[in-house]
Amino acid sequence: MHADSEALATLPADPVSQLAFRDAMSSLAAAVNVITTDGPGGRAGFTATAVCSVTDQPPTLLVCINRSASVYETFIENGLLCVNTLGNGQQDLSNLFGGKRSQQERFDGGQWESGVTGAPILNSAKLALDCKVTQSVSVGTHDILFCQVLDIRDQGESDALVYFARQYHHLPGAAPAA
């Protein structure tokens, strides 16, 4: 798809405001994830909703991380991560990893084991996607980490925790098949 130069000339010169953009993004419901890593750079984690599938050949997802985040260098140095998707009842863990607590305090909030990459996997996660980072692209204040999925642990039809309109919401899992 290519836009012609005449169409581009009619576009606004300035982007929308940061506030307007954030307000608009709050209207997009998203799964709540705790992103974790462990390796030579240390063990770290943060809460993220900016996670998205990219392709299934090879299985790849993306995670966005702010370059000013205290955990940024740790994730870049380790080059691996686990996307731990949270379920109903795990809002406190999301807040813990999204706050200003020490990494030790964050990890004390759950039971963990090491995945195939060495990244911490939350035993009670609805879904865990264990990944190696294959590419990083900088856009604005963030890096987009493209991650090849090496292992999946799925708790099945459990309830989901989502973030929408700046609030947590719980979605029921699928009803059992009759």
UniProtKB/Swiss-Prot annotation:
Domain of life: Bacteria
Catalytic reaction annotation: FMNH2 + NAD(+) = FMN + NADH + 2 H(+)
A Pfam family matched in the record: Flavin_Reduct
Single GO MF descriptor: FMN reductase [NAD(P)H] activity
Matches recorded under Gene3D superfamilies: Electron Transport, Fmn-binding Protein, Chain A
Presence of the UniProt keyword Flavoprotein in the record: yes
GO biological process, one term: nitrogen utilization
EC number: 1.5.1.42
Key word NAD present: yes
InterPro entries: Flavin_Rdtase-like_dom (IPR002563), NADH-dep_flavin_reductase (IPR050268), RutF (IPR019917), Split_barrel_FMN-bd (IPR012349)
Function: Catalyzes the reduction of FMN to FMNH2 which is used to reduce pyrimidine by RutA via the Rut pathway.
Family from the record: Belongs to the non-flavoprotein flavin reductase family. RutF subfamily.
This protein's name: FMN reductase (NADH) RutF
Gene this protein is translated from: rutF
